[in-house]
Amino acid sequence: MAAKSDGAAASASPDPEGAAGGARGSAGGRGEAAAAAGPPGVVGAGGPGPRYELRDCCWVLCALLVFFSDGATDLWLAASYYLQNQHTYFSLTLLFVLLPSLVVQLLSFRWFVYDYSEPAGSPGPAVSTKDSVAGGAAISTKDSAGAFRTKEGSPEPGPQPAPSSASAYRRRCCRLCIWLLQTLVHLLQLGQVWRYLRALYLGLQSRWRGERLRRHFYWQMLFESADVSMLRLLETFLRSAPQLVLQLSLLVHRGGAPDLLPALSTSASLVSLAWTLASYQKVLRDSRDDKRPLSYKGAVAQVLWHLFSIAARGLAFALFASVYKLYFGIFIVAHWCVMTFWVIQGETDFCMSKWEEIIYNMVVGIIYIFCWFNVKEGRSRRRMTLYHCIVLLENAALTGFWYSSRNFSTDFYSLIMVCVVASSFALGIFFMCVYYCLLHPNGPMLGPQAPGCIFRKASEPCGPPADAITSPPRSLPRTTGAERDGASAGERAGTPTPPVFQVRPGLPPTPVARTLRTEGPVIRIDLPRKKYPAWDAHFIDRRLRKTILALEYSSPATPRLQYRSVGTSQELLEYETTV
């Protein structure tokens, strides 16, 4: 059997491949998962794995502080506008707070409904553990009512006894309380706060529990962190980004020394944008074991990079919008359309359906209005350089148009604003270079390096060997008589002849960023793995996630995830004749 992510039955069988190839991976859509067991008695094979540390807890607490400061300053500023009878500014400020929050809370509650809902006719996914013929532990789950499937001759506890009326009543009461609590939390617009606190709780539980439960809680913590990082990314660019431009425009329009409250709101929005981008990239790298994790030094460098880059971008927008409001709207729409089509042309692979992918590309187009956001696997140096050149030209043009409308012969304030935009953009580029040259997880990325290499010190060259066959033969020339006689003489003399069939060497394997487990149970997913910077499928597809968690919790040892290898299906294409 196979465990489908849409709720079908899931089971495990002994891994025919043994312990080979066991990296946890991800797929590009809904797929099938099966869990197979390794050697009997192996618990937590492959080492202790990652651990939740104190600095991880501090990072979550800082994220909560940024979240509350951003929302509180915006609401405080809206109330101030209302008390000053500035109803237009009050309406715009409150609109940029409430509308994105409602969208994000609806999405978060939709995820909760699916995560805590149960299939009709079943109290929950039934999970059993049994001994396979090969001596390993096999796992089986079913989402429909009924008994477990068993193998002949294997000890099986049989159908689970029906729960008593008291336990069923307590279970219903508990579920009702959870639903009421989650409904209240999302009505109060605190769904992300709940997810932050739950990620913190799961991380602490993974630190305090035993080895098997530690891995289980750590997986759940990664899932929760991924959810809240995606929600925060969506909310900040729908709320904090327009709020930043609005308040900066009002400050520029008024001139003089800025008031304290608008300055606090602008600073909080700017920090929220920079923090969310860095936190998103950190959680994304932490969730993939084929990538090195992002250190906190690198995350801080990313915060400073985005902080100064977005500050320069937002200030250029505010200067231009304070004079040319209509043209600013046209510019924003045109820039968003161009960037969205650029992202679509890149053929991203992020979501599970075509329409979700289009919506995701539209959101990325909004992000590209303000800053760089990598969405395509591979070397992004050229794309990033092109984007920053475009942003530099746009910032210079927007600031230049605003400066030309001022009386620059007597207005020293205008010259200061131009210098602030230029210096802020330069600082952003500086911290970006610091990150890529010193703090990138894969090592220096902007220095001289061999094409195709990931690490500076490689044990072998990254290119194919000199004797590798790089292209198939275009024709097979007819063997001449002299060649036939020479070959016969060589065979009679005992000269070794070259093999008729040779396997063309493939690409060299990518150095593994972390120590991967090669023992114990394995959950196989019959789909190719998504390429970075996309999320793994079990982070996006919630049905696949539920199935994996059920298999993982029922296993006596912590399983590892294994996705289908892309090269396996084209194995026959690697053979060529050398007649």
UniProtKB/Swiss-Prot annotation:
Residues 1-40, 146-165, 466-510 are annotated as: Disordered. It comes from the Eukaryota. It is found in: Cell membrane. The keyword Membrane applies. The chain crosses the membrane at residues 59-79, 89-109, 260-280, 314-334, 355-375, 384-404, 415-435. It is a multi-pass membrane protein. Keywords: Cell membrane, Membrane, Transmembrane, Transmembrane helix. GO terms for cellular component: plasma membrane. InterPro entries: XK-rel (IPR018629), XK-related_scramblase (IPR050895). Residues 1-18 have a biased composition (Low complexity). Belongs to the XK family. This is XK-related protein 7. It comes from Homo sapiens (Human). The gene is XKR7.
